[in-house]
Design a protein with these regions (language model features):
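Secretome/extracellular-domain signature
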Residues: 45-168, 180
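Extracellular low-complexity, Gly/Ser/Thr-rich intrinsically disordered linkers
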Residues: 176-184
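Calcium-regulated, polybasic anionic-phospholipid
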Residues: 26-42
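Extended extracellular/luminal ectodomain segments enriched in beta-structured repeat modules
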Residues: 21-28, 57-61
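Surface-exposed ligand/attachment interfaces on beta-rich extracellular proteins
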Residues: 11-22, 129
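Short amphipathic, basic-aromatic surface patches that mediate peripheral association
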Residues: 15, 36-38, 73-76
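Boundary/junction segments of secreted and surface-exposed precursor proteins
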Residues: 1-13
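A motif-centric signal for short, conserved binding hotspots located
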Residues: 169, 174-176
Length: 184
C-alpha cells in the first residue's frame, strides 16, 4: 500500500518544501532546469532534465528549488543578450542533494538580428553540446556557460547546484538559484 499522486512545483523565487505522506516509501522526481533567456535571434538554451526514483520515509521533509528563466535585458536595441536560466534542485537535510538539473545558457546577440554564438544547454552527468564557438555545455548539474562574442561573454550561463552560471550575466548558484540578468 501507499499513496500515489503527483505534486508539481513552479518557480516562486523561494525554497519550497514537500513532506513525504504517510505510507509512502519511494518517490519519483522529475526536475528541469530553467531555460536561458531569449533574444531577438531566438530562444535561450534549454535546462537539463533529471528523473530518478528515491527511497524516502514518511514525514521526511524535502526542499525544492525551481529555477527562474533567464532574463532578457530590455534596452530597445538589437544588441540585447540574455541571462542564464536558474537550476532546479531537490535536497534533504544537510543539505543532501537528490536531484540537480542545471539551467540553460542565455542567448548572445551582439550587433546582429541573428545569434552569433548559440547558448549551451544544461546537462546532468555528461558534457552538453558545444556552441558554435566551442563553448561547452554544463556538467554534473552545472548550468550551460555564457554565450561569447569575440571571446567576450555577452550572455549569462545557466546556474548549477554548486556553481554560478558562466560569464558576467550568469545565474547564481547554491542558496540563490536565480536566472541571470540580461546585457545591453
Amino acid at each position: 500500500g501507499g499513496s500515489s499522486g503527483t505534486q508539481t512545483f513552479n518557480y516562486t523565487g523561494a525554497i519550497q518544501t514537500f513532506t513525504v505522506p504517510v505510507g509512502v516509501t519511494s518517490i519519483t522526481i522529475d526536475a528541469r532546469g530553467a531555460q536561458g533567456g531569449g533574444s531577438n535571434g531566438g530562444a535561450g538554451g534549454l535546462g537539463a532534465r533529471m528523473t530518478g526514483t528515491y527511497t524516502v520515509t514518511p514525514g521526511q521533509v524535502l526542499s525544492v528549488v525551481v529555477g527562474q528563466q533567464g532574463l532578457l535585458q530590455v534596452g530597445g536595441n538589437a544588441q540585447n543578450s540574455s541571462g542564464g536560466g536558474g537550476g532546479s534542485f531537490v535536497f534533504g537535510a544537510g543539505p543532501t542533494l537528490l536531484v540537480a538539473a542545471g539551467g540553460g545558457g542565455g542567448k548572445c546577440n551582439w550587433l546582429s538580428s541573428s545569434p552569433l554564438h548559440p547558448e549551451a544547454a544544461g546537462q546532468i552527468t555528461t558534457a552538453g553540446g558545444a556552441s558554435s564557438d566551442g563553448n561547452p555545455g554544463g556538467t554534473g548539474g552545472n548550468g550551460g556557460p555564457a554565450g561569447l562574442w569575440s571571446a567576450v561573454p555577452c550572455a549569462g550561463g545557466g546556474t548549477g547546484w554548486s556553481s554560478n552560471g558562466g560569464g558576467p550575466y550568469g545565474g547564481l548558484g547554491y542558496n540563490t538559484w536565480t536566472g541571470g540578468p540580461g546585457f545591453c
